[in-house]
């Protein structure tokens, strides 16, 4: 975050941007886990959306938490219901606690294998502590990895 308490998160994937309410999973679509955006990937590499560090890596390798320098907490979830794949199409390139630069590869995954198993590859990027921020989607349609995707502005503390 800068002096204005604002941060830009970049697209962690190459693909098509989707509003969360269009995601075919009720928990994500209704914002139960937080606000954010989703990308339907065309390439199977999930990258760091900002400078920060890896929080928790899920045992099934389909999801991780990411702590953005400045305070935002993210959930990056590759595909919908892909926990059932038990990690098979996912290769994690980082470890818990590892510092990462924006654009650094976090997880490589096989889009074809996920789809062949009957799963949707739509990948939500959730701001878990979204109650602390005002979010603005910066991109529509097709995006490349590293393209500005989401602006976070820290809300004023209530007095």
Q: Model-predicted segments: where are they?
A:
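Contiguous, well-folded functional domains in the mature portion of proteins
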Residues: 1-159
């Amino acid at each position: 975050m800068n002096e204005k308490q604002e941060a830009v998160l970049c697209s962690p994937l190459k693909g098509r941007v989707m509003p969360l309410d269009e995601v075919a999973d009720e928990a994500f679509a209704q914002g139960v886990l937080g606000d954010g955006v989703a990308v339907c990937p065309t390439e199977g590499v999930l990258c760091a959306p900002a400078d920060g560090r890896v929080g928790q890596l899920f045992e099934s390798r389909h999801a991780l938490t990411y702590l953005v320098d400045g305070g935002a907490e993210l959930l990056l979830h590759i595909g919908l219901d892909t926990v059932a794949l038990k990690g098979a199409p996912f290769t994690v390139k980082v470890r818990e606690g590892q510092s990462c630069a924006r654009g650094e590869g976090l997880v490589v995954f096989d889009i074809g294998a996920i789809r062949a198993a009957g799963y949707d590859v739509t990948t939500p990027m959730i701001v878990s502590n979204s109650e602390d921020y005002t979010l603005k989607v910066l991109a529509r349609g097709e995006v490349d990895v590293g393209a500005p995707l989401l602006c976070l502005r820290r809300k004023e503390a209530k007095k």
